[in-house]
Amino acid sequence: MKVPFLQLLCLNAALASANVVKGAAQGFAAGVTGGGDITPSYPKTNEELVSLLESDEPQVVVLTKTFEFIGTEGTTTENGCAPWGTGKSCQLAINSNGWCGKNPVVTITYDNAAKNGIHIKSNKTLVGEGDKGVLSGKGLYFEGGVSNIIVQNIKITNLNPGFVWGGDAFTFFGADLIWIDHCETSLTGRQHYVTGFHPNTRMTWSNNFLNGVTTHSAGCDDHHYWTMELVGPGDQITFQNNYVYHTTGRGPALSGTTLFHAVNSVWSSIPGHAIEGGDKGRGLFEGCFFEDVVEIAPAKPENQLFSASEANAASCKSALGRACQANSYSKSGAFGSSETGFFKDFAGLTIAPAGSATDALAYVPKNCGIGRL
């Protein structure tokens, strides 16, 4: 029996951690409770917000305004570089860890706050009220084994968009049981989502808007390149009902040994490529829609990819316990990868339900991101 797309989104809704959270995580992060039933806190200042998120106690934190971090930690002026020229729409780069190499040297000035995210600790719920919950000039950082965290209905923006290495929206460096839902990321210096060199397990990223429209880019236009760099060993990510828009690369880069289950997500307006990475990255894509994507993935990708079609959908049963939903395409390149050798790695994980790709196209772009719960 075919389950309607909207009904899929309502499954397990009774498991929400507190009344400020809408719905419940599906996929790998199923069961996450965040701060639980703790009485919500409504911070008024940056200092109050940081203190709550970095505390060792469970917290439910509700954002009711824009928290402006730009200028709060000063600026740095130093030598950087111009890998793509100095045109008004070209990104320059911070010389992080000697990244600039032999590229032309230029003097740059960037805001310090965006380079250092808030180090959110375990058992937290962070939720925005309506469309008001915005972090401007500061991202979130999950490290050191933190677990059981919900972030829902917020926007992270203005992270030194003119500079590569200027700031990441969501950084994961050893985390478990994390649900990122209905969030928008935009105007980042580097990645919208990045996983580091420690395992990041049981994560669900759902209903998010990865907005690639930017002021400066590696292509010297308004398409952001640095989208999702996933390099953790053994990352486990359900990528459900997300909208990747107006980017040109790394969407995602499966560069570590990430297990990436993309379900009912939409990629649109991508003049470059979407998927890349190394030979150990693993990605299953089903019920997804690719619209105006010049190159979805290389014809012979290094990584292990499975793109669901009507012809191969039944082969998913060994991994997911059900057949896959076929992907769909409009004005996009081919995506014929059918590697199944990694399907055994789904054992023991909670699998998100899937609807059709055409239903995803109709629903996801209009309902993802902040203010659309």
Swiss-Prot record:
Q: Where in the cell is it found?
A: Secreted
Q: Which UniProt keywords apply?
A: Carbohydrate metabolism, Cell wall biogenesis/degradation, Disulfide bond, Glycoprotein, Lyase, Polysaccharide degradation, Secreted, Signal
Q: Glycosylation annotated at which residues? A: 123
What is the catalytic activity of this protein? Eliminative cleavage of (1->4)-alpha-D-galacturonan methyl ester to give oligosaccharides with 4-deoxy-6-O-methyl-alpha-D-galact-4-enuronosyl groups at their non-reducing ends
Q: What is its EC number?
A: 4.2.2.10
Q: InterPro entries attached here?
A: Pec_lyase, Pectin_lyas_fold, Pectin_lyase_fold/virulence, PEL
Report one GO cellular component: extracellular region
Q: Which residues are responsible for catalysis?
A: 250
Q: Which GO terms describe its biological process?
A: cell wall organization; pectin catabolic process
Record-annotated disulphide pairs: 81-100, 90-220, 316-324
- SMART domains attached to this UniProt entry: Amb_all
The UniProt GO MF terms for this protein read: pectate lyase activity; pectin lyase activity
Secretion signal: which residues? 1-18
- Where this protein primarily resides, as one coarse class? secreted
Could you tell me which Gene3D superfamilies the record lists for this protein? Single-stranded right-handed beta-helix, Pectin lyase-like
Function (record text): Pectinolytic enzymes consist of four classes of enzymes: pectin lyase, polygalacturonase, pectin methylesterase and rhamnogalacturonase. Among pectinolytic enzymes, pectin lyase is the most important in depolymerization of pectin, since it cleaves internal glycosidic bonds of highly methylated pectins.
In terms of PANTHER family, this protein maps to: PECTATE LYASE 18-RELATED, PECTIN LYASE A-RELATED
Family listed = Belongs to the polysaccharide lyase 1 family.
**Name of the protein described by the UniProt record:** Probable pectin lyase C
Organism of origin is: Aspergillus niger (strain ATCC MYA-4892 / CBS 513.88 / FGSC A1513)
Coding gene?
A: pelC
